[in-house]
């Protein structure tokens, strides 16, 4: 068994290159090891989104790469030798108005030369600068009014001709990064660069939504997406006997969506694989392998081999699934304690029915204590965080303030107008707008039937715990007599939220969510921008990741120990120092999930 070095993935991978094997290891310096390829040296596609499929014969295991993975993404990025090998590439719609190109390389193991070809995509005849300028005008108007730091924004020079390249590269992102007063909107990446929490998402008008009528009648609809059901991955790097990296990697599953190809194949939190389509995972294919598994974009098939003796490849085929963030719930019995355990990965209001079903399961189990696992929850819809907080606290929160809101100075100066726009009341003593807990009616559902009536809550957290997740912690701490204990690592520290605007330009609908308010609990305490400190420090891995609900999983074990008073052998406040295993924070990959993050409030007209 190989020794492994664990690595966390959250943001874009920079500067990683394939390790050269040297001339002595090559079979032929003049050929590529590929014959019978169906691609041409230069391929041209139209501006619309398309998937291009090619076939070829490979003399050995192979790896494919794109130098523009943000819009030209390889779905089958590696494979074994043989004839009729397939290379599937998704090219996203081009709304930039300009022709763009991507270079594709296919490297066969043992061959010095790689096969190469180019894909050129034409610019949109109906999009381009004109369409993007119209889009930017709408974004600009909304930012001038809603953005929390609109004073500086109104004074700066803005380039309305910037193209919408992607959700991470557009007028909104570029302009807000130039500002200086909006420090609470900025987040520092592991490579030292910055991004902003405010976002602009684009969706084709033809994308379907679920027609099933939910019990909760707020109108936030479910949306299917292609996926294997792998909700999160943690990377691992192999090291040799001297604890030095070998150049090979593996991936460990951190969460699996219910009713998905991955869950049906037996994948769970902690499943660890080191081969992808029969080939090792290396620096050369790590980015594309990760991207394919998290966001395949179509019905692709992959083969994954677990890192254990005698493991056989397991085939997974992506299909349209519902990314249900309610990952796990159960009642744990220990002596007189009946402990409710809930793992929740995103405050996605589209799945409020599923969340309420999980809460009802705990209520019917007559729980005496509760552990809420938000370690992977980056936030989402405020209405869902209010709903869950209400269910946890029960009758104690009736008629109490859930959260106070501070908007920009111009909106705070026009109280009546802002009250009409937001649907929130104004507290003249606190000089802030507010929402109450939803005890009673929640969009047609009586939350009194789901009241758990807890007075103490244990929350499992990490640096990925943010926004609406932190709001649950902070707002419950705002209730007199309610105790919240944090176990794990310091949280993210995001105390600001967004109001969502939706509009259409051309063939796309847009969701714009600029940071527009700061949140406070009933005691007018906001979340520390440096993160919420934990009461008990604990790291979630110690040579492996254990599944949710495993009583020896370090963070859960720490919570159970505090509740029952029985110390578990798994409880530890420090990371394992076992030889050959150490954390690495120098490598990072993009967050490609479509789960809502942040602290999101729908304006009354935007609830649909």
Regions found by a protein language model. Give the residues of each.
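C-terminal "post-core" interaction segments
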Residues: 339-342, 350-369, 378-608
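Surface-exposed binding patches on compact interaction domains or structured appendages
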Residues: 33, 57-88
